[in-house]
Amino acid sequence: ESGADILCLQEYSTVQSSKHLSQKDVERELKAYPYHRINTVGSGKGHTNKIACYSKFPILSSRILDYPSEYNGSVLYEIKIGEDTVTLINNHLESNKLTKADKVVYEDMLKSPEKEKVKSGARLLIRKLAEASAIRAPQADTIAHEITASPHPYIIVCGDFNDTPISYTHRTIAQDLDDAFTQSGRGLGISYNQNRFYFRIDNILTSKNLRAYNCTVDRYIKESDHYQIWCYITKS
């Protein structure tokens, strides 16, 4: 319904079941997108995490980026748009691995901010967040290298970074790019919306020879713990 030319999806899943969407169901609904690539990412045994791209333009190639992760990953596509070839990197970076119990601890801290409860809860959460951040750092380095090495001048990087705009992850990936939301969004841009963890962790970044406008965190779809983010992109 969005009319977008390119859709980038993380944690993509289809099941041959009457209760779930099958791949045929998805292709029927997305018949306006004649080109698609679906890649399984992560090195863990029995993993089912997939990243997908549906496009109205030809996808010339897709390649999973080489960095360590049991469940997460990034995929680089070359997409032909008119006379130009665009490098597009679709990301689902390392998750923070907070359990339901951890999220309850966080909610309790907010509801009843007693000194000892906050101290012990903060210590637990900081340790877990730091562990995930340390894993994301080399992932961000790999993506930054791919951006620098791209043979094509037009570059778009998007997806779930699982980290905030002031993080090493975001700074490293975005160092030579423009942030579409910073450039043309409104408000805080909160994209993760569960358990009172209200953060902007989903992004669209573009090379500086492109211009993003009307970047929007769309709250229309409520079923996910992430809101979708979209924007228009033109040549500068």
Features from the language model and the residues they span:
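Metal-dependent phosphoester-hydrolase catalytic domains
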Residues: 78, 137-156, 161-236
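N-terminal signal-anchor transmembrane helix
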Residues: 1-2
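Short C-terminal domain-edge/linker segments immediately following a structured domain
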Residues: 39-42, 83-84, 96, 117-124, ...
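Second-shell loop/turn segments in exported
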Residues: 11, 126-133, 158
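Extracytoplasmic/secreted proteins, especially bacterial periplasmic and envelope-associated proteins
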Residues: 21, 25-28, 49, 124, ...
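Soluble or luminal CAZymes and related metallo-dependent hydrolases
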Residues: 69, 131-142
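Structured beta-strand-rich core segments of catalytic domains in phosphoester-bond hydrolases
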Residues: 6-106, 220
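A solvent-exposed, charged loop/short amphipathic helix patch at secondary-structure junctions
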Residues: 103-129
